[in-house]
């Protein structure tokens, strides 16, 4: 089933809202389970100052999104662009089944693509 980290972070994340004054937003969906996630980023001097999200997601996506958010606030966007699946595994302290890998990185992927949109670099990351 789910470890304690996933169970805790899947309940009522306080960063579930549409930020009013954001610099970039981005939407992604997981085509395996149809989770939908939209992130809102406030970026100043290439530092993530705030991150919020709205979603229609399962427990894994919600929990990984919230724990991911906690870890990237005040990080440089270039550093955030280097993070991938292994980073999520470190955060949740557990491997994720193949069936749930896309769910575990949906917030990360959506954030990376929001940053690419912010940078206007033409890059689109995929699962």
Please report, for each region that a protein language model flagged, where it lies by residue.
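C-terminal binding/interaction regions
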Residues: 1-20, 24-26, 49, 75-127
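N-terminal cap/leader regions of alpha/beta-hydrolase-fold enzymes
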Residues: 12, 44, 61-65, 81
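Short connector loops at helix/strand junctions that flank enzyme active sites
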Residues: 21, 34-36, 48, 63
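Short beta-strand elements
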Residues: 30, 35-45
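A short interface-forming secondary-structure element
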Residues: 42, 46, 51-60
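Short, conserved micro-motifs enriched in small and acidic residues
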Residues: 55-63, 98-105
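Alpha-helical support elements that line or immediately flank enzyme active sites
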Residues: 60-78
């Amino acid at each position: 089933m789910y470890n304690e980290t996933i169970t805790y972070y899947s309940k009522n994340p306080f960063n579930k809202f549409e930020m009013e004054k954001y610099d970039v937003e981005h939407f992604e969906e997981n085509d395996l389970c149809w989770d939908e996630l939209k992130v809102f980023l406030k970026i100043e001097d290439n530092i993530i100052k705030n991150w919020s999200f709205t979603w229609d997601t399962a427990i894994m996506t919600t929990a990984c999104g919230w724990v991911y958010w906690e870890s990237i606030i005040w990080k440089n966007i270039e550093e955030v662009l280097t993070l991938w699946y292994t980073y999520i595994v470190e955060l949740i302290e557990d491997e994720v089944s193949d069936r749930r890998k896309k769910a575990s990185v949906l917030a990360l992927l959506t954030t990376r693509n929001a940053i690419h949109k912010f940078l206007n670099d033409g890059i689109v990351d995929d699962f």
